[in-house]
Regions:
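Hydrophobic helix-and-loop "lid/oligomerization" segment in the mid-to-C-terminal part
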Residues: 27-218
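Hydrophobic, small-residue-rich alpha-helical packing segments that form membrane-like cores
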Residues: 1-18, 28, 35-36
Length: 218
């Protein structure tokens, strides 16, 4: 919907939201009703939370009804992730900080297919096993994030780069899955455009983060 040639009236949908609209269009073509699509809304709400898109317009509606599914009848994979949360009713903020990081951790540390297996599993026992593995990935992600951020800050200090207008750091063994998080941490610390590099095969991989009014993409 952000394409200039797209006439759809709401342009803040995340990728999953666009996918849901496709499913909705297919359902209408097959004379199905919105009731047939409710089972997907826990995933849509999770994606809205994970992508930090604005909770306005259609996102607000999708998030509201998605949260109702999460709090009443979530799919086994989501249920397995939240069953130890000591809250009776989860909000979109809870999904941002509890559900989304765990799903993202699979792709950051191992492979995104593990998260796909979790959210498409119908057997609760198997889903709980997948959730346990993903919980370990999330713990590993936190530890890597902490360690690499520490190393990056030390590198800046050792190179006397505390007062530069930008941050560029590199270490060949930094885990590619967390350098984006590390870049965000460095922006929080120095508030300046930041690029974190690591080695990926025979090439370099990097994540960039910036500050308000400074576009590192264009």
């Amino acid at each position: 919907p952000k394409r200039e040639d797209c006439s759809y009236p709401y342009d803040e949908l995340c990728g999953c939201g666009v996918g849901f609209k496709l499913i909705q269009a297919l359902a209408e073509n097959r004379n199905q009703t919105i009731d047939d699509l409710v089972l997907y809304l826990d995933l849509v709400a999770t994606a809205i939370a994970a992508d930090i898109v604005p909770i306005t317009g259609e996102n607000r509606v999708l998030a509201k009804f998605g949260l109702e599914v999460i709090n009443s009848n979530p799919r086994p994979g989501i249920k397995a992730l939240i069953q130890n949360v000591k809250k009776k009713v989860l909000t979109i903020t809870d999904v941002v900080f509890i559900v989304a990081p765990r799903i993202n951790a699979a792709g950051r540390i191992k492979h995104g297919n593990e998260a796909v297996a979790l959210v498409t599993e119908y057997d609760l026992d198997q889903a709980e096993q997948f959730a346990s593995e993903i919980e370990q990935h999330n713990s590993d992600r936190k530890e890597l994030d902490k360690q690499i951020t520490k190393e990056a800050l030390l590198q800046i200090e050792e190179n006397n780069e505390q007062n530069r207008f930008s941050t560029v750091v590199y270490q060949e063994n930094w885990h590619k899955g967390v350098i984006g998080i590390v870049a965000s941490r460095l922006v929080e610390n120095y508030y300046r455009p930041t690029i974190v590099f690591t080695k990926s095969g025979e090439k370099l991989a990097a994540s960039a983060r910036s500050v308000k009014d400074f576009d590192v993409y264009n």
